[in-house]
Each structure stands twice: as C-alpha cells, then as structure tokens.
C-alpha cells in the first residue's frame, strides 16, 4: 500500500512539473534582444522560423516622450506591430503617428496615456486589441479606418473626453 501511495505521489509530481513547464512562456535570447530607437525600444522577430528576422516590433516607449513617430522600418525591417502595453502610462505623450506597415495595435498599447490627444490609425491596421486606448483622458475624437475589422473589448474604456468616433460598418 505504501508503495502505491509513493508511486502515485511521484507520478503526480511529474505530471504537475510537465503541466507547469508546458504553460511557461518560451523565448530565446535573440527574440528578446531589446534595442533603442530614439524614444522607442524594439525587438526584431523571425515570423517564419527560417532563422532570419522578418520584422520589428515596438515594445516600449520612454515615459517622458511627448510626440512619437513610429518609423515604418528599423534596421531595414518593417515595423508591423506594437507589443501589448508598449506605450502604457506614457502620461506626457500627446500625439503619435503610426506608419502603414503596422497591422495591429496591441492590448493596452496606449492605455493610461492621459495626455494623448491625437493618433492616426493607418489603413494597414486590421485589429485594435482590448484596452488599446483605455484611460486616454485627452482623446477627443478618433477615426477608425475601413481596414479595421475587429475592435476588442474595452478598446476605448474610460476615454472620458471622447466625443466623436467613426467606426466602419464591417467592425465586429
């Protein structure tokens, strides 16, 4: 009986370890090599697994930045996205320009940017993820381009100054 209990405990421990390791995020050091570009921080990523980086992703912004122009390219690679929460709580940020190379605005990307008054969303963007502009207290109007087909939950939550928003008919 003791042997069965010990075996059961051992097997349970192995299963728990396997389960935990399978849900732990994996990233190689190459993927997470954060580099600076003006007020921005970025990483380069390999999307097709061929060992060559294909695009850049904005991962952070200097919290004292006032006006930011996201470049279309960094290191000759297109900037395709902003990481979740990349600009979050940049309270000095008043305006941001997003290039046509960007196709998605990450979760909480501009959340808490309380001074953000204007942003251009290019026609290349197809998705605005959850809480993207949450608590952007100075944002008064925004136009969503026809290319956007999905706006996730709370994208504009607590945008207390928002008085005008144009959303295309095809948005879900």
Predicted feature residues:
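Structural signature of tandem-repeat unit edges
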Residues: 41, 63-80, 91-104, 113-127, ...
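Acidic, glycine-anchored loop motifs typical of Ca2+
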Residues: 47-53
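Sec-dependent signal peptide cleavage junction
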Residues: 20-38
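Sec-dependent N-terminal signal peptides of Gram-positive bacterial secreted proteins and lipoproteins
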Residues: 6-26
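N-terminal secretory signal peptides that target proteins for export/translocation
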Residues: 1-5
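Consensus positions within tandem repeat domains that build extended binding/scaffold surfaces
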Residues: 83-86, 106-111, 129-134, 152-157
């Amino acid at each position: 009986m003791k042997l069965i209990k010990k075996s059961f405990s051992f097997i349970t421990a192995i299963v728990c370890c396997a389960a935990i390791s399978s849900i732990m995020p994996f990233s190689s050091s190459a993927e997470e090599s954060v580099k600076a570009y003006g007020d921005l921080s970025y990483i380069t990523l390999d999307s097709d697994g061929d060992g060559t980086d294909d695009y850049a992703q904005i991962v952070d912004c200097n919290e004292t930045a006032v006006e930011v122009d996201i470049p279309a390219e960094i290191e000759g690679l297109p900037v395709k996205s902003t990481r979740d929460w990349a600009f979050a709580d940049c309270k000095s940020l008043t305006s941001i320009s997003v290039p046509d190379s960007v196709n998605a605005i990450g979760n909480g990307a501009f959340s808490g940017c309380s001074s953000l008054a204007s942003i251009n969303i290019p026609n290349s963007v197809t998705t605005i993820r959850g809480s993207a502009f949450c608590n952007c207290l100075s944002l008064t109007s925004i136009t969503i381009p026809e290319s956007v087909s999905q706006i996730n939950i709370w994208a504009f939550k607590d945008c207390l100054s928002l008085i005008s928003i144009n959303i295309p008919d095809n948005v879900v």
